[in-house]
């Protein structure tokens, strides 16, 4: 069985979502998992109930089961690392985009903007960062766009004049098939980013090492 299929079936069988698989030099196999997401109810939003998050115990459980499954399939690796998504979490499907509406994301297009840039940005540009928004597509189906400003952000503690003209906003609409990569922007402010998931981590290398 292929590595992707083995890992995906094992993770799903335990009730988790597979976010990403990475194989690094030195035999490291890194698996990122998350809890299945459902849109919060209006009552939960009003009450400020946070999303559940992956814990160290979740990562340990997946690690143990993956060890067994990978051994059965004869997968060659030296170290297995299972963790929750970081602040640069990849966005893979419509549900991920729905989940993170309002967040700042980084996207990379498969092809440069070309004539569609219309002089607003470089025609060769493929990478963009902006706030993710949901929009209605031409056929009425849900669509997506990011919105950003090229104006520099005020520095911490800097006073902004009330007479200052609003910064010009740019918007880029897209469909998922146009994207090579999409991730949450790894932004941390002085107060700390509002976490969508809390870090869980489990590392196996001739034993189990689980940092706090």
Curated annotation (Swiss-Prot):
Q: GO CC annotation: what is one?
A: cytosol
PANTHER family registered for this protein in UniProt: RIBOSOME MATURATION FACTOR RIMP
Kindly name one Pfam family recorded for this protein. RimP_N
Task: Give the family this protein belongs to, as stated in its UniProt record.
Answer: Belongs to the RimP family.
**Function, in words:** Required for maturation of 30S ribosomal subunits.
Looking at the record's lineage, which domain of life comes first?
Answer: Bacteria
Name of the protein in its database record = Ribosome maturation factor RimP
Keywords attached to this Swiss-Prot or TrEMBL record, sorted alphabetically, are: Cytoplasm, Ribosome biogenesis
BP-aspect Gene Ontology terms: ribosomal small subunit assembly; translation
Q: Which HAMAP family match?
A: RimP
- Gene from which this protein is expressed: rimP
Q: Where in the cell is it found?
A: Cytoplasm
CDD domains the record matches: YlxS_C (cd01734)
Which InterPro entries does the record cross-reference, listed alphabetically? Ribosome_maturation_RimP (IPR003728), RimP_C (IPR028998), RimP_C_sf (IPR036847), RimP_N (IPR028989), RimP_N_sf (IPR035956)
């Amino acid at each position: 069985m292929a590595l992707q299929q083995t890992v995906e079936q094992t993770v799903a069988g335990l009730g988790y979502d597979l976010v990403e698989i990475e194989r690094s030099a030195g035999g490291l196999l890194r698996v990122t998992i998350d809890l299945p997401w459902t849109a919060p109810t209006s009552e939960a939003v009003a009450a400020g109930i946070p999303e559940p998050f992956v814990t160290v115990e979740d990562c340990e459980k997946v690690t143990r089961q993956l060890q067994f499954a990978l051994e059965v399939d004869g997968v060659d690796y030296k170290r297995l690392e299972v963790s929750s998504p970081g602040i640069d979490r990849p966005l893979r499907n419509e549900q991920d985009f729905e989940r993170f509406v309002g967040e700042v994301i980084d996207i990379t297009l498969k092809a440069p903007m070309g004539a569609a840039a219309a002089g607003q940005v470089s025609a060769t540009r493929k990478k963009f960062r902006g706030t993710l928004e949901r929009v209605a597509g031409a056929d009425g189906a849900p669509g997506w766009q990011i919105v950003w400003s090229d104006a520099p952000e005020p520095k911490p503690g800097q006073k902004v004049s009330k007479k200052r003209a609003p910064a010009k906003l740019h918007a880029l609409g897209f469909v998922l098939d146009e994207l090579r990569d999409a991730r949450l922007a790894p932004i941390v402010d002085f107060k700390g980013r509002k976490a969508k998931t809390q870090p869980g981590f489990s590392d196996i290398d001739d034993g189990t090492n689980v940092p706090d």
